[in-house]
Amino acid sequence: MLATEAAIDKLGARGISISEAEQMIWNRYVVIRNRRGSAARPQRNIRRLPIGRSDSGRFLTLVIEVTVEPTTWLLITGWESTPAERMILMKA
């Protein structure tokens, strides 16, 4: 996962370290499509929201962008998962 300085700053403002965000990928997670935005905005097609847990058990939701390299994601931002997002993970 790649993260820009802006993404690291956004995570930090929410009390999430980049290492905590990366831990989520090695634990159980689900990926949902980004439903925000209009059909005219490309974000809707290239952004995904992985929902999972860090090693400490904290539920996180990240916003990632698909890159030209299929095994590499660009981290945009993230937050502590909402109750609805946690439910998506638990039901998966």
What are these regions (language model features)?
Residues M1-A92:
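Ribonuclease/tRNase effector modules and their secretory precursors
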